[in-house]
């Protein structure tokens, strides 16, 4: 790489949206990462292992150029195409996200003597059986790792067999220049468009519609809450594989009038400013980007005590927290906040203050420093 002006990096992920999802959380991260890398020092390319999917169109519309492998997770043709891309674009290092990407990327890196970074983004209940074999073979030889939270780092060390001294925790954060405070009139008008007046209480959940995200539990809590506060509603933002089932589940319980599905929204950072409380009832998470957004706009937060959420939030200070699946405690917390204006105000202020610790440019800077350290090691 002697004499090169820039370091060529290939970011390889599993997919941008997954099944029935417009945009995955990882893809949303790429949307703000890619334009912010220092182009005088780095040429960063973005590739999906799975290929073109529903979310790729959103990525392209945002101005990103994409590459694809286009084969199944364990299809060896991934390796052949990846090697071609590495050679064609003179790639210096690979930054890998996800099982398939991590498998073929590490093999290609070993064959071509290219360094790789494994980036852990979530905690799973178990590693697929075939992947366990892969991780036992490749994990101990992984030299560079990043994790979105300390719990994800621990997961990578325990289940992916990556040496504990190579995994660095780097919180994603959020670019503050993408947060635009909305006026009181705008928020009032938007709520009105969705049938909510100024006295209605809006609870919000943002994210992929998956069974483990806790949407049903939040709706069960809403049923309890409406016995005391009948004008409380939930807005659900996002799409995903659980969408049809969740719609049917809500309809079967006669809740269609108080659970509003807004689908995938590009203006999510504006809409969440209309919430009275933002809910994070997941059973597992890495550190959701939606949590960084909620902090940045100063929302009152109620969250399950899982993984990265438990790291970022402090119960009773920056959020009220509960054990995942505890519907009664979730309902109690919501009622307490809605019935105690000074508590809501305190949570909002603490949320905004906590967000100052998660400037997204710190994440970019940390990644760029790692790229340069790896590059320097290659020259020795």
Language-model region placement:
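A conserved mid-protein helix/loop that constitutes part of the nucleotide-sugar donor-binding site
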Residues: 22-32, 201-227, 241-248, 320, ...
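Short hydrophobic beta-strand element within catalytic cores of glycosyltransferases
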Residues: 46-48, 300-303, 313
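A conserved, positively charged/aromatic
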Residues: 118-146, 161
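Donor nucleotide-sugar binding/catalytic pocket of nucleotide-sugar-dependent glycosyltransferases
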Residues: 140-184
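A short helix/loop element that forms part of the nucleotide-sugar donor recognition site in Leloir-type
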Residues: 180-196, 343
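A short, well-ordered alpha-helix in the C-terminal region of glycosyltransferases
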Residues: 192, 329, 336, 343-357, ...
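Aromatic "clamp/platform" in nucleotide-sugar-dependent glycosyltransferases that forms part
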Residues: 264, 283
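Conserved acidic donor-binding segment of nucleotide-sugar-dependent glycosyltransferases
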Residues: 315-316, 320-327, 336-341
């Amino acid at each position: 790489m002697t004499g090169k002006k820039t370091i060529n990096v290939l970011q390889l992920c599993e997919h941008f949206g997954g099944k029935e999802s417009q945009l995955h959380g990882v893809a949303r991260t790429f949307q703000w990462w890619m334009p912010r890398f220092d182009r005088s020092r780095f040429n960063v390319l973005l590739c999906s292992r799975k290929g073109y999917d529903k979310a790729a169109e959103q990525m392209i519309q945002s101005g990103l150029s994409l590459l694809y492998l286009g084969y199944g997770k364990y299809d060896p043709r991934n390796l052949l195409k990846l090697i071609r891309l590495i050679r064609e674009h003179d790639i210096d290092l690979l930054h890998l996200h996800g099982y398939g990407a991590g498998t073929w990327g590490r093999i290609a890196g070993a064959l071509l003597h290219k360094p790789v970074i494994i980036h852990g983004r979530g905690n799973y209940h178990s590693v697929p059986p075939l992947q366990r074999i892969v991780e036992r073979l490749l994990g101990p030889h992984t030299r560079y790792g990043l994790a979105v939270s300390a719990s994800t780092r621990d997961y990578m060390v325990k289940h992916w067999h990556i040496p504990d001294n190579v995994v660095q925790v780097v919180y994603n954060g959020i670019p503050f220049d993408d947060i635009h405070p909305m006026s009181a009139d705008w928020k009032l008008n938007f709520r009105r468009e969705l049938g909510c007046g100024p006295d209605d209480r809006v609870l919000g959940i943002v994210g992929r519609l998956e069974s483990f995200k806790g949407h049903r539990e939040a709706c069960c809590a809403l049923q309890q809450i409406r016995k005391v506060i009948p004008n409380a509603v939930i807005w659900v933002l996002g799409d995903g594989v659980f969408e049809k089932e969740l719609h049917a589940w809500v309809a079967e319980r006669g809740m269609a009038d108080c659970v509003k599905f807004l689908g995938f929204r590009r203006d999510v950072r504006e809409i969440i400013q209309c919430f009275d409380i933002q809910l994070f009832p997941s059973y597992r998470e890495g550190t959701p980007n939606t949590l960084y957004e909620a902090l940045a706009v100063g929302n009152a937060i109620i969250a399950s005590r899982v993984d990265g959420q438990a790291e970022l939030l402090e119960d009773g200070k920056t959020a009220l927290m509960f054990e995942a699946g505890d519907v009664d405690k979730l309902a109690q917390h919501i009622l307490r906040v809605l019935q105690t204006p000074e508590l809501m105000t305190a949570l909002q202020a603490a949320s905004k203050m906590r967000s100052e610790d998660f400037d997204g440019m710190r994440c970019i800077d940390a990644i760029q420093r790692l790229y340069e350290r790896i590059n320097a090691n290659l020259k020795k």
